Curated annotation (Swiss-Prot):
Gene name per UniProt: Slc38a3
Annotated effect of mutating residue 210 to A: Does not affect L-glutamine transport activity. Does not affect cell membrane localization
Topological category with respect to the lipid bilayer: Multi-pass membrane protein
Protein name, per record: Sodium-coupled neutral amino acid transporter 3
Species per Swiss-Prot/TrEMBL record: Rattus norvegicus
One GO process term, biological-process aspect: cellular response to potassium ion starvation
Subcellular location: Cell membrane; Basolateral cell membrane
pH dependence: Optimum pH is 8.
Length: 504
């Protein structure tokens, strides 16, 4: 028996990285919508207040977003904190293998968007979770919502980890301290809690976060600024640095530095070998490469809302927007990884920006980049938290009236859990690895393929047709990558051989 189509309203809200959690609100009739508005006056309205009393339906919504702005919005959705870990990924794969893997993930991401657009065109649904509902009923919707929620939690965790990692260095620079001191305002754990309570939580408790949508452009600008700084610093930082020759755990004692300076003077061949790039590398940390790349390319839940906002929409036009956005991010990712790697080689840490503190803690350019990135991620966290809270409302409290107590408790509980994760996580690599190995393969590979297989009518494409066979193979690749990545990461943890950069 065919599941009846649902009429959906989708709200497009550009923000720093993630629109993933935008959850559609069912709108079967105008009367029921007015009743729901009375009940859910807080969460139900979304980020931006509507100027019109009539909410848009996907069937009658007239998009007004141009081609260029849609490319900007989708590029903004792709871009995120994942760019900070790509140089570390290149250090553990080599330039050639990294380029191959980055190209493969980009092409596969484009193909999965193609599957999503074809599926949405068949059933007239432009919301990721509702495609899951159309394909597998409530379990499909819940699975998609869970994956999107995990992805958003991973994004918030990575943002808070950047605050934990970078804010002490900014304070150290402003106080003109050569070395960090054991005081509370230099402790990243205290600082991330302080920022969460004083700045993030009050913003997350607001009913409307529309004005924070402007952080969208600011966040993307910060990452472009970061890329320019990385390229510039490649030609300013000499190689070799004594700091670079220690292991990536960040243990830079004075004695080690002196010994290594002596070693460099007596053994120039060692220095030359260190400053020679690797083109193909396999080690225990290579297992993190694909998850980091997958984390960096997740934008699929945003594709359909952006499609809804597009002026004169068509699948072909939206596919061109997706291809162009992925291509732009592909170039930015490769340049950031390449120049970051060629600056520090094997000394690069899992959070690239933190590595520059080993060169010159008082560098003005890097300080400006740090401050800009800190402001961007701090403003982005409450925006990313909003759809996660809404997902919880939709799944657990769908038919209940808005409650301030529940509103506050959900936000506080989420921030508490994420803070605990950030405090006890040894480095950002673990966050990139786990989220990139679980929710990212589901959103990029598995769900688009199986949704397409289920939704596409057999009259148009039989079960054994080439497109459906390719879709199943695509899903199988996703399962394989997820299983392999998780296996390698867990093995790395259990064996205790992990030497992640960026411990603080």
């Amino acid at each position: 028996m065919e599941i009846p189509r649902q009429t959906e309203m989708v709200e497009l809200v550009p923000n720093g990285k993630h629109l993933e959690g935008l959850l559609p609100v069912g709108m079967p009739t105008a009367d029921t919508q007015r009743a729901e508005d009375a009940q859910h006056c807080g969460e139900g309205k979304g980020f931006l207040q509507q100027s019109s009393s009539k909410e848009p339906h996907f069937t009658d919504f007239e998009g007004k977003t141009s081609f260029g702005m849609s490319v900007f919005n989708l590029s903004n959705a792709i871009m995120g904190s994942g760019i900070l870990g790509l140089a570390y990924a290149m250090a553990n794969t080599g330039i050639i293998l990294f380029l191959f893997l980055l190209t493969a993930v980009a092409l596969l991401s484009s193909y999965s968007i193609h599957l999503l657009l074809k599926s949405s065109g068949i059933v007239g649904i432009r919301a990721y979770e509702q495609l899951g509902y159309r394909a597998f009923g409530t379990p499909g919707k819940l699975a998609a919502a869970l994956a999107i929620t995990l992805q958003n939690i991973g994004a918030m965790s990575s943002y808070l980890y950047i605050i934990k990692s970078e804010l002490p260095l900014v304070i150290q620079t402003f106080l003109n301290l050569e070395k960090p001191t054991p005081v509370w305002y230099m402790d990243g754990n205290y600082l991330v809690i302080l920022v969460s309570v004083i700045i993030i939580l009050p913003l997350a408790l607001m009913r409307q976060l529309g004005y924070l949508g402007y952080s969208s452009g600011f966040s993307l600008s910060c990452m472009v600024f970061f890329l320019i700084a990385v390229i510039y610093k490649k030609f300013q930082v000499p190689c070799p640095l004594a700091h670079n020759l220690v292991n990536a755990t960040g243990n830079f004692s004075h004695m080690v530095v002196v010994e290594e300076k002596s070693q460099l003077q007596s053994e120039p061949d060692t220095a030359e070998a260190f400053c020679t790039p690797s083109y193909f590398t396999l080690n225990s940390q290579t297992a993190y490469t694909i998850p980091i790349m997958a984390f960096a390319f997740v934008c699929h839940p945003e594709v359909l809302p952006i499609y809804t906002e597009l002026k004169d929409p068509s699948k072909r036009k939206m596919q061109h927007i997706s291809n162009l956005s992925i291509a732009v991010m592909y170039v930015m990712y490769f340049l950031a990884a390449l120049f970051g790697y060629l600056t520090f080689y094997d000394g690069v840490e899992s959070e690239l920006l933190h590595t520059y503190s080993k060169v010159d803690p008082f560098d003005v350019l890097i300080l400006c980049v740090r401050v800009a990135v800190l402001i961007a991620v701090t403003l982005t966290v409450p925006i990313v938290l909003f759809p996660v809270r809404r997902a919880i409302q939709q799944m657990l409290f769908q038919n209940q009236e808005f409650s301030w107590l529940r509103h506050v408790l959900i936000a506080t509980g989420l921030l508490t859990c994420i803070n605990l994760l950030v405090i006890f996580a040894p480095n950002i690599l673990g966050i990139f690895g786990i989220i990139g190995a679980t929710s990212a393969p589901c959103l990029i590979f598995i769900f688009p393929a199986i949704f397409y297989f289920r939704i596409m009518p057999t009259e148009k494409e039989p079960v054994r047709s080439t497109p459906k066979i390719l879709a199943l193979c695509f899903a199988a690749v996703g399962f394989l990558l997820m299983t392999m990545s998780l296996s390698f990461i867990i093995t790395d943890w259990v064996s205790g051989t992990s030497q992640h950069g960026g411990n603080h």
